[in-house]
C-alpha cells in the first residue's frame, strides 16, 4: 500500500489494528512456564540479585555494596485508539516495573513495531511522543530505541533504573501477618474491552485512561518503609495472578476481602454487558487451580488483566500506619484488601 492510499490520520482507530490490547496480550502464566524451562546448563552470576526465578517485575544487578541496577522491558499492542495516549500508557506501564522494585528510573529506550504499509508514519510519531511524555513525567530521557516493520502496532520501553540495596523490594518476600494494600482500582481490562466492543460511552472514556496514565512513582517511597516486606505491580495476570506469585514465593496464604477490592467507576456496569477480555479466561485457566471456587463474576474481577495497574503492597501491622500516612499524603486512598498468613488450606487464596 502506497502512502497515498494509507488511511487518513483523523480516521484511524488503533485498536482496530491489533488482535489484543495492552497487558491483556501477555502470554498466559502456564505457557510462559514452558517457554522459560530452558534445557541449557544453568549459568549463575552472584551479582544478579533478582532474575526470572521468582518472576519478579524486573532484574536487579548488584553494582556495588550499596547500589543495584534495575533492568526491565514491557511492550504491547494498542489498548486505546488515540496514538499519543497509547504511547503514554505503554511507557507508564513499562516504567512501573522500576517503581515496583522500589527503585527510581534513570533512562529508557523505545521498542516500536509498526505496520508501515497500513498506518502512516505520522501516527507512529505520535505514539513515540506519548512515550516521551511519560518519560518526562518520570524525570527521565527517552534515550534511543529500535523499530521494525510489524503486522500490528507495538510499542513499549526498555527501562534502566537504580536502587539502594537497602530499599530493594521483591514479590516473594512477604511475611505471615502482613496486611495487603492496593494503590489503584481494578477493572481496566473490563473498560478497555468495552471500548474494543464499541460499548464504551464517550463520558466514560477517560476512566481507564486516567488510571493507566498515573505513574506508580510512590513505589520508591513505599520501599523506604522498613515494614514493607513485599511489593509488586498488578498487570496482565490480574490481581489474583500477581497475588498468587506473592503467596507462592513466600509460601503463604492470602485472606482476600473481595468486597474491599476497589473497582473503577462503571466497571460493574460494563461487566454486566459481557465486557470480559480474553486474558481473563487465559489467566483463570493458568492458575485457577490455586484459587477457591469462584463465580463467573468473581473470576471477571480477580482475573481481569490490568495495564499500568497499581502496586500491591505487603506491610507488617507495625508499619501499616506509616504506609497509610504516606498514601494519604500523596492523595492515594489507602485500601486494605486482606492479609497474609501461614498456609491453612490447599489453595493459596481464601475469600473472606
Curated annotation (Swiss-Prot):
Lipid metabolism listed as a keyword: no
Residues noted as binding ATP in the record, renumbered to the chain: 26, 54-56, 74, 97, 145-147
Gene Ontology cellular component annotations, sorted alphabetically: cytoplasm
Catalytic activity, EC: 2.7.9.3
Keyword Kinase among UniProt keywords: yes
Needed cofactors: Mg(2+)
Cofactor mode of binding and number, as noted: Binds 1 Mg(2+) ion per monomer.
Keywords from the named record: ATP-binding, Kinase, Magnesium, Metal-binding, Nucleotide-binding, Selenium, Transferase
PANTHER family given in the database record: INACTIVE SELENIDE, WATER DIKINASE-LIKE PROTEIN-RELATED, SELENIDE, WATER DIKINASE
Subunit structure: Homodimer.
Function: Synthesizes selenophosphate from selenide and ATP.
Name of the protein in its database record: Selenide, water dikinase
